[in-house]
């Protein structure tokens, strides 16, 4: 049996009760934290809180050599953990398909995701979001600007009146000069806003910082203004709103501090 368990957004307590029970009853527990991280807890915190040993795998190991996970699932109850929800990444869908092909029963226990939290915290309606995109560090894509794919996604959504979630790059184990096991870097919202402001400086944007934590921050303003502010510890993301329903506009003013004249434009 292979159970995929989403850990939620922030720390060892963000998991659902159902997920916690499945985790504690597993014979072996694997985890992958490349796709996203729990910035409020490390592996030691998770192991202590859930009274279990966790075997962390690199993303490449999950994608290219998942045999240890699959073999464990054939022999007993195995749990596979990620931050957020495990099925957001195609890497984990592939692992589930491999398990099913080998006759291994699978189960998914969902966790809260950054996208659902972004909608909840900002007051932007869930069904008015379009395709999401990820903004990489400039060195990660070999340029010094915003990739065309990111611009195309935002513009396509805006043309349809839809909001865009912009996930911000995470680099763990790889830095500007190549592989580095000690490298851990998170793009912050001010850096992202600065990159996107080159061409959209007056565009409305919303920062969501540390969703799921006790000190989550939501702030809305022009991209150029957000680029000059600091939002504290990661994880951060940006939302580029499309057309606003009047309730959404009120929410951005009341919950995120957006200038009233900006949401009326």
Swiss-Prot record:
In terms of SUPFAM superfamilies, this protein maps to: Tetrapyrrole methylase (SSF53790)
Name its GO BP terms in alphabetical order: methylation; protein histidyl modification to diphthamide
Record has Transferase as a keyword: yes
Q: What is its EC number?
A: 2.1.1.98
Q: Which reaction does it catalyse?
A: 2-[(3S)-amino-3-carboxypropyl]-L-histidyl-[translation elongation factor 2] + 3 S-adenosyl-L-methionine = diphthine-[translation elongation factor 2] + 3 S-adenosyl-L-homocysteine + 3 H(+)
Gene behind this chain? Answer: dphB
* Subunit details: Homodimer.
Q: Which domain of life is it from?
A: Archaea
What PANTHER family does this protein map onto? DIPHTHINE METHYL ESTER SYNTHASE, DIPHTHINE SYNTHASE
Instruction: Name the protein family.
Output: Belongs to the diphthine synthase family.
Give the Gene Ontology MF terms in alphabetical order: diphthine synthase activity
**S-S bridge residues:** none
Question: One Pfam family from the UniProt entry?
Answer: TP_methylase
Task: Reply yes or no: does the keyword Membrane apply.
Answer: no
Query: What keywords are assigned to this protein?
Result: Methyltransferase, S-adenosyl-L-methionine, Transferase
Associated pathway: Protein modification; peptidyl-diphthamide biosynthesis
This one is known as Diphthine synthase
Q: Where does S-adenosyl-L-methionine bind?
A: 9, 85, 88, 113-114, 168, 211, 236
Q: Which stretch is the leader sequence? A: none
Q: What does the function comment of this entry state?
A: S-adenosyl-L-methionine-dependent methyltransferase that catalyzes the trimethylation of the amino group of the modified target histidine residue in translation elongation factor 2 (EF-2), to form an intermediate called diphthine. The three successive methylation reactions represent the second step of diphthamide biosynthesis.
């Amino acid at each position: 049996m292979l159970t995929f368990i989403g850990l939620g957004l922030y720390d060892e307590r963000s998991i659902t009760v159902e997920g916690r029970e499945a985790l504690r009853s597993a014979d072996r527990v694997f985890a992958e934290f490349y796709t996203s991280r729990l910035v409020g807890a490390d592996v030691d915190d998770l192991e202590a809180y859930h009274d279990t040993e966790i075997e962390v795998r690199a993303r490449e190991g999950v994608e290219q050599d998942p045999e240890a996970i699959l073999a464990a699932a054939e022999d007993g109850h195995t749990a596979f953990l990620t931050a957020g929800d495990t099925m957001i990444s195609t890497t984990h869908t592939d692992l589930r398909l491999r398990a099913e092909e080998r006759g291994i029963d699978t189960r998914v226990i969902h966790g809260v995701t950054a996208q659902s939290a972004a909608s909840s915290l900002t007051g932007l309606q869930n069904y008015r979001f379009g395709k999401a995109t990820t903004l990489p560090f400039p060195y990660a894509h070999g340029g010094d600007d915003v990739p065309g794919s990111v611009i195309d996604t935002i513009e396509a959504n805006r043309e349809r009146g839809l909001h865009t979630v912009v996930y911000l790059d995470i680099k763990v184990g790889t830095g500007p000069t190549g592989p580095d096991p000690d490298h851990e870097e998170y793009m912050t919202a001010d850096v992202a806003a600065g990159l996107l402001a080159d061409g959209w400086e007056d565009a409305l944007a919303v920062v969501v910082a540390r969703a799921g934590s006790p000190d989550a921050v939501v702030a809305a303003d022009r991209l150029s203004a957000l680029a000059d502010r600091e939002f504290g510890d990661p994880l951060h993301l940006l939302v580029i709103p499309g057309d606003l329903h009047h309730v959404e506009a009120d929410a951005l003013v009341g919950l995120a501090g957006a200038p009233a004249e900006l949401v009326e434009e």
